[in-house]
């Protein structure tokens, strides 16, 4: 626990202290946000606000992770060094953040709403996602556990949904596809949620906070300890909890400057990097489907865009919402930006609570704690 506390505080301090320095750096170079003309009129005042703040969040994550492990080693705390799971998850996070950085930098330098072309962004994300998936199925520990498994998971692996049903080679190929689908879904979900001051930052912090609890619980109920009923076959759960704690702290530190009126935006650097991190946590903690519940707000926002675009094409130009994503619909209905953000945070908290309840309920059922219910 001391490791999680040190990591979380370090992430918070590095992010909170580093963000204003980064703001000055961006302002000095004129790196400001480009605002679309067809967006809500209240957003016109956001034009020129420094962006790419995700670089501070991700940078704080990496730096705090390395410093924490170093400090724990010096203090003689038996926490273990950086693990394969931790390093591979960081690779995915940093890789996706890099794609977002290129996209942000292109928008800023060319002063347009389109950065990378959709095809270019998809290709870069697929390359990083594929590298992540392949690495995640390697590096077995002393029990033979790799960071990821080929089984599709809900609150844990589902044995009868193993993608390696036709052999290891087919399993790897299908897992690469499945992993890329998850990564694409989470990165786009965070990206679409990042439209109002502090919305995506706060919502993501709630989800990563949930992954601190999930990973901690998996560590305490690991099959490596006693192999009791309902135990978890997860590699490096404590290191995953550390990363989740650091990222939560980094997000809260950034939120101090990102809350309304925002002094800086996370940009695609942040949204894609955070989406990559959420995908990594979901895959490594064997909660690939459950993450859709934890991130229920982001799922709803993403669906609002899909529904809007789909109905617009089918109906010949009609719209379901005043504007998509969903948060802008409520803005146009007259809700103040802060009102939308706080109410959406509450919805996100509800989703996270339901997700954690499902996760714990799954374990409880396997202990025989819910009579008449089978896992």
UniProtKB/Swiss-Prot annotation:
Enzyme Commission (EC) number: 2.7.8.13
Record localization: Cell membrane
HAMAP family: MraY
Disulfide bonds: none
Pathway stated in the Swiss-Prot or TrEMBL entry: Cell wall biogenesis; peptidoglycan biosynthesis
InterPro entries: Glycosyl_transferase_4, PNAcMuramoyl-5peptid_Trfase, PNAcMuramoyl-5peptid_Trfase_CS
Top-tier EC class: transferase
Protein name: Phospho-N-acetylmuramoyl-pentapeptide-transferase
Domain of life: Bacteria
UniProt keyword annotations, A-Z: Cell cycle, Cell division, Cell membrane, Cell shape, Cell wall biogenesis/degradation, Magnesium, Membrane, Metal-binding, Peptidoglycan synthesis, Transferase, Transmembrane, Transmembrane helix
Organism: Micrococcus luteus (strain ATCC 4698 / DSM 20030 / JCM 1464 / CCM 169 / CCUG 5858 / IAM 1056 / NBRC 3333 / NCIMB 9278 / NCTC 2665 / VKM Ac-2230)
């Amino acid at each position: 626990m001391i490791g999680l506390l040190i990591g979380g505080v370090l992430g918070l301090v590095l992010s909170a202290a580093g963000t204003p320095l980064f703001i000055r750096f961006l302002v000095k170079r004129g790196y400001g946000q480009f605002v679309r003309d067809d967006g809500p009129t209240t957003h016109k005042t956001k034009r020129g606000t420094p962006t790419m703040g995700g670089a501070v969040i991700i940078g704080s994550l990496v730096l705090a992770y390395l410093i924490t492990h170093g400090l724990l080693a010096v203090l003689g705390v038996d926490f273990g060094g950086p693990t394969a799971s931790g390093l591979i998850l960081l690779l995915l996070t940093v890789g996706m953040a890099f794609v977002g950085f290129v996209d942000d930098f292109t928008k800023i330098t060319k002063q347009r709403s389109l950065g990378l072309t959709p095809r270019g962004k998809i290709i870069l994300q697929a390359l990083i996602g594929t590298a992540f998936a392949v690495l995640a199925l390697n590096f077995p520990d002393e029990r033979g556990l790799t960071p990821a498994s080929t089984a599709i998971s809900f609150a844990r692996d589902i044995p009868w949904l193993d993608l390696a049903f036709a052999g290891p080679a087919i399993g790897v190929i299908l897992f690469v596809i499945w992993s890329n689908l998850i990564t694409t879904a989470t990165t786009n979900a965070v990206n679409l949620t990042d439209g109002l001051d502090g919305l995506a930052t706060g919502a993501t912090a709630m989800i990563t906070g949930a992954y601190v609890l999930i990973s901690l619980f998996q560590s305490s109920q690991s099959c490596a300890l006693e192999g009791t009923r309902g135990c978890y076959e997860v590699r490096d759960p404590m290191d995953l909890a550390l990363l989740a704690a650091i990222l939560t702290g980094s997000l809260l530190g950034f939120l101090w400057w990102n809350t309304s009126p925002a002094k800086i935006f996370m940009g695609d650097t942040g949204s894609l990097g955070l989406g990559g991190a959420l995908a990594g946590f979901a895959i490594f903690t064997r909660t690939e489907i459950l993450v859709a519940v934890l991130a229920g707000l982001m799922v709803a926002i993403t669906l609002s865009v899909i529904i809007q675009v789909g109905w617009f094409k089918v109906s010949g130009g009609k719209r379901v919402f005043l504007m998509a994503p969903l948060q802008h619909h409520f803005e146009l209905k007259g809700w103040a930006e802060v009102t939308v953000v706080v109410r959406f945070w509450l919805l996100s908290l509800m989703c996270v609570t339901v997700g954690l309840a499902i996760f714990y309920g799954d374990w409880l059922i396997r202990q025989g704690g819910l009579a008449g219910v089978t896992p």
